[in-house]
């Protein structure tokens, strides 16, 4: 009975260590993914939002339309 209890306690401790380590690893992977994609990539944005920017001139819009034909 004592042996089973010791094995159970060691298993519980190892499982807790695994869960804490996995959370750290998954957290770091998620941070890396977010830094690669960036803020705009994770937002639900239309790709044509820049066309409505007031800083774009008519020539810029014409060039963009030619590029995407």
Curated annotation (Swiss-Prot):
GO terms for cellular component: extracellular region; membrane; other organism cell membrane. Its main location: secreted. Expressed by the venom gland. It is found in: Secreted; Target cell membrane. Residues 1-23 form the signal peptide. Residues 41-69 form a propeptide. The modification Valine amide is found at residue 37. Keywords: Amidation, Antibiotic, Antimicrobial, Cleavage on pair of basic residues, Fungicide, Membrane, Secreted, Signal, Target cell membrane, Target membrane. GO terms for biological process: defense response to bacterium; defense response to fungus; killing of cells of another organism. Amphipathic peptide that possesses relatively strong activities against Gram-positive bacteria and a fungus, but has very weak antimicrobial activities against Gram-negative bacteria. Also exhibits very low hemolytic activities against human erythrocytes (64 uM induce 21% of hemolysis). Belongs to the non-disulfide-bridged peptide (NDBP) superfamily. Short antimicrobial peptide (group 4) family. This is Pantinin-1. It comes from Pandinus imperator.
């Amino acid at each position: 009975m004592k042996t089973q209890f010791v094995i159970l306690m060691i298993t519980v401790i190892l499982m807790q260590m695994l869960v804490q380590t996995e959370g750290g690893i998954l957290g770091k992977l998620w941070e890396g993914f977010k830094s690669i994609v960036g803020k705009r990539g994770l937002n639900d944005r239309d790709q044509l939002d820049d066309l409505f920017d007031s800083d774009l001139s008519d020539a810029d819009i014409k060039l963009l339309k030619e590029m995407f034909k």
